[in-house]
Amino acid sequence: MASQQMSTNNAQMSAQQAAVLQQTQAQQLSQQQDFDPVHRFKMLIPPLKDSLQNVMTIASLNFAHNTAIDNGLKTTEKGNDAAVQRFDKSLEEFYALCDQLELCLRLAHECLSQSIDSTKHSPNLVPTATKPDTVQTESLSYSQYLSMIKSQISCAKDIHNALLECSKKIAGKGQGACN
């Protein structure tokens, strides 16, 4: 009896732990997707379609209203104009969504450029502790990675010092050339 109760308690605890783990993973995935520009872009497409449809609907209603006024079927009374929706507000909403989409695309392009540059300048990866079962054949050890980073920092400092020296020579001579 006691062993059955312990096994059910253990099963309940493992089920609770699994549920908590799933919830944590879902939250992490959601947070990653919030910062992913491609995911954000995909999420903005349906509101953009709705906004465009709204702009076209309001434009057609305003066009029909103005045509009726031009043909003399309606008069330009204050109460009549209140029923017509504001085209400029709906167009502004559409442009705001377009601007957000543009920013998402620029951010995605910048992320891609950084990824390409990172791969070009540091093609070998450092193995991560999160995935011990996967073996990376072309990975660097941590000490190799540190030495590579130190050499990159040293190179950047050398370039910085050369530029400083050149600027001092130019400032000192007025119009001298750098060697």
Curated annotation (Swiss-Prot):
A GO term from the CC aspect: mediator complex
One GO BP: eye photoreceptor cell development
Keyword Transcription recorded: yes
Claim: Repeat is one of the keywords in the record: no
Keywords: Activator, Nucleus, Transcription, Transcription regulation
A GO molecular function held by the record: transcription coregulator activity
Recorded superkingdom: Eukaryota
Recorded family membership: Belongs to the Mediator complex subunit 29 family.
Function: Component of the Mediator complex, a coactivator involved in the regulated transcription of nearly all RNA polymerase II-dependent genes. Mediator functions as a bridge to convey information from gene-specific regulatory proteins to the basal RNA polymerase II transcription machinery. Mediator is recruited to promoters by direct interactions with regulatory proteins and serves as a scaffold for the assembly of a functional preinitiation complex with RNA polymerase II and the general transcription factors.
Subunit-structure text: Component of the Mediator complex.
UniProt-recorded name of the protein: Mediator of RNA polymerase II transcription subunit 29
Primary gene name: med29
